[in-house]
Amino acid sequence: MRKAIIAMSGGVDSSVAGLLTKETGDECIGATMKLFHNEDIGVKREKTCCSLDDVEDARNVCYRMGIRYYVFNFSERFKEDVMDRFVDAYEHGSTPNPCIDCNRYLKFDKMFQRMRELEYDYIVTGHYARVEYDEEKNRYLLKKAVDDTKDQSYVLYMLTQEQLAHISLPLGGLRKTEVREIAEKHGFVNARKHDSQDICFVPDGDYAKFIEQYTGRKSIPGDFVDTEGNILGKHKGIIHYTLGQRRGLGIPAASRLYVCDISPKTNQVVLGNNEDLFHSELTATKVNLISCESLKEPMRLKAKIRYRHPEQEAVAWQTEDGVLHVRFDKPQRAITRGQAVVLYDGDIVVGGGVIENCIK
């Protein structure tokens, strides 16, 4: 019998993942990571995670399953590796994905450390993706979920071979409707609970307001400029803008203007037309490859530049310094620094990295 830690968010997915694991006969405990509570900033919304209600829901489910339940306090690590990184990225003109950082540094790093300390064998999560071992390649592979509408392989591209060897994703072969049916059948209190949709520490979606509250600093106004460098007006501070943004600029113009670039060095926000947002190539750093050791030779595949962005035909390769280059068959709109680019070969995740630059 192996021993599993069920990483429980309080939602229906991780609860059913835990149930399916328990039914295999393995010894299980449930654990919720205490990261950041919305109540700490006086906010409560239904479609976020990390609330006190979520902890109670997870505890209730564990009670029904007859397994022990724990709360691991990782709030200090969350502040350092997720919230601080989020703020720093915005202040440097990037648009980060904190959910990927949470997986990278908390769920599949800090939780792994706790797993080893407790002498457990593997971690179970409610992510919609699949892990399979390829005998020929002698490697673990990360694959898309059967339910395309819920696939979360994009936010797991950073997983290493060591981590994949100690992860179970029981929902990868199920559809969301099936998961809810299982939860209802077993009387789980969260069977019809909303999926979390917002960043847990910015539940109202106002990133600039959060950053100012978090740092205690007001954002510094600067210039809006066109693509030639001509001043068009004043902006409220670069943390208020992201690539492709059109609303809230406050600049009168004969044609629609979009945020085409953000320069933290000059504190300028570059505005242009829609065509200025399209680029054919990007570079990425912090690269992690899963299905292979390297991409020294160009490989034809598909790439996603955002979580909800459709996959696009492309060619990818690495230079000697390890930087990932991705060239698209068709120019892509609003390739954004700080977001992840994830590469797919069919339903297999090849790997990915953090977007650094884009090239026309």
Say what each PLM segment does.
Residues G126-K360:
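AMP-forming adenylation/ATP pyrophosphatase catalytic core
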Residues M1-Y157, S168, E178:
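ATP-dependent adenylation/nucleotidyltransferase module used to activate substrates
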